[in-house]
C-alpha cells in the first residue's frame, strides 16, 4: 500500500511541477521534495527522469482524451445512426481559436512534442495516446458524414486536422492583431466539412 501511495504522490507532485515550471524546468529533486520522498524512490518507480515524464505526460494526455471522449459520447455511440450527429453538432463541440483553455492545452502539447526527440519512453507513450485520440476523432468525423458514399481517406485527413487543432491555435495566437476570429474559423470549417459531403 505504501509503495502505491508513494507512486501516486510522486505523480501528483510531478504534475504540479509541470504546471509550474514546464518540462524543461522540471527537476527530479523538486518532485521528490514536494512528494515528501527520495530521488532514489522516484528512480525505483520510474527508472529515470525520462520514465517519470513519460508516465506523467502520458497520463495527462489520456485524461484530456477522456474528456474529449465524454464530450463526443453521442457521436461515438454504436447506437447512434450515421448522419444523426451532424456537421453542425460537430462544430458546436469543437474548440475555437481564441479559447484560452485550449490555447493553454496547445502550449502543453507543444512542449510535450518538443521533448519527444530526446525521450524514447515519452515518444512511445505519446504515440499510444495520439493514436487513441485519432481513432476516436476518426469515428466522430465518419459519423458526422451524411454522404451517400463516404470517402474514408477524407475522413482520415479531417480526423488528423481536428485532432491537431491545439497546435493551430498556438500559431493563431502569435498573429496578434491579425488573428483569425472564432466566427471566421467556424464559418470556414462548416463550408469545408459540408463540401466533403457533396
Roles of regions detected by a PLM:
Residues 55, 68-104, 157-162, 186:
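Hydrophobic alpha-helical connector segments
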Residues 123-127, 144-196:
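Hydrophobic/aromatic-rich alpha-helical bundle segments in the mid-to-C-terminal region
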Residues 65, 70, 100-110, 120-146, ...:
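Amphipathic alpha-helical packing segments from all-alpha helical-bundle domains
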Residues 9, 13, 17-55, 59:
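Helix-turn-helix
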Residues 47-51, 55, 100, 117, ...:
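Residues in soluble alpha-helical coiled-coils and helical-bundle/repeat scaffolds
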Residues 1-5:
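N-terminal intrinsically disordered/low-complexity leader segments
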